Amino acid sequence: MNNKLLIIILMSVLGFASCGKENRSERIPEKEPPAGIDFPEDDGAKRLPADGALALRDLLAAVDPAKTLTQGETKITEKQFAEIKQFIDNNLKADSKIQTYNNIFNWIVKNVRYGSGNETIYLDPYDVFIHKVCVCQGYANLFKIMCQSQEIPAMCVNGWLVGVGGHAWNYAYVDKEWHVSDPTNGIDYKMEDTGKYRDMLQPIRADFNLFEDGKFAYNFEEGRLNVAEVKDSGLDYVLVPFSINGFRITSFCPVKKVSGTYDKLYLGSNVESVGENTVYLSSNFSTLREIDVDPANKFLTAYKNVLYNTGNDAPYFIPPAITRLELKPVKVIEKNFICRLENVEEIVFAEGTERIEAYAVEKCRNLRKVYVPSSVTYMDKDAIYDCGDKVEIVR
């Protein structure tokens, strides 16, 4: 009798708690419990400054300059590289590295010009070397290769020429210190003198990997310390670490294809971004179908394997390999709300959704069912578009 009474009381309490949740304005929790994974703990690592010039300065102080002796993203053949090196050896090489560096810089400033109008604009370093007409990226590419040919570590960076727009320039390491070199505009500073250039040159990415460990490679991307490459571990999940070399990792946006058996992603409290354009993550991590986020994360949250910016009910990122997509309630589902999810078979719009506009779901070729709640008062005839002719609308 006592056991039965206890069960009745327990059921009543649970029923009361459930009713209490139903009366709340937010029926879907912002945070979900972790799926049996230990998220990385805050280890006190430094978060990079929001100022790109200061952030890159801090990172480069911890980087082996020799890492920037590789060509990386810059396209050039061995024969072309040898020709440029021979030219410098014969004409610009001096007794000291710093004088050679200055000679290279001055030669580019004097001999290469910025293209305009209907001219052919060159970007690859050898083409710029031969034709001497380019835009800022061409200047930076040639300067990088010329420096590297003389064993002067150098890299290209992209970012903003403040007040003008997107820009490319260089960082080079000579005489045991980094220089910030902008051959397009004929200016050169020591990196430590940030006050002289940070209001003008704001880097947001660098063209090489800063750090590497047994599981990942890391770069400077979108002004953040980013997971750039994921190495095959034989596991089915990727757990983003909290830090590397004393710096907090705040971005997960691989720039190379993620290979191996991975289909799950776990983001700790440190990760703030998976890229401004999530197309890159979808393309490079095409096997991803599950996402979970540390409940302590203040920037991101996951619901039913969909990633959201905290406080925003519109999806930030939908895993490309997801097969059943369940969404938070959004009053109006706009055009291209869901697009090009080749693996999704079912979409569930949540109660609270009111309108589904034309082309809200587009080019999901394996879609079979769309669940539409009673709260939807308008659904355009083309709301589900170019998804084949086998889609069933379930109300």
What residue spans do the PLM features occupy?
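Short beta-strand/loop segment at the start of cytosolic alpha/beta domains
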Residues: 209-231, 310
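Structural signature of tandem-repeat unit edges
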Residues: 215, 220-222, 233-250, 260-275, ...
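Sec-dependent bacterial lipoprotein signal peptides
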Residues: 1-17
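Hydrophobic/aromatic-rich core segments of domains that either
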Residues: 139-202
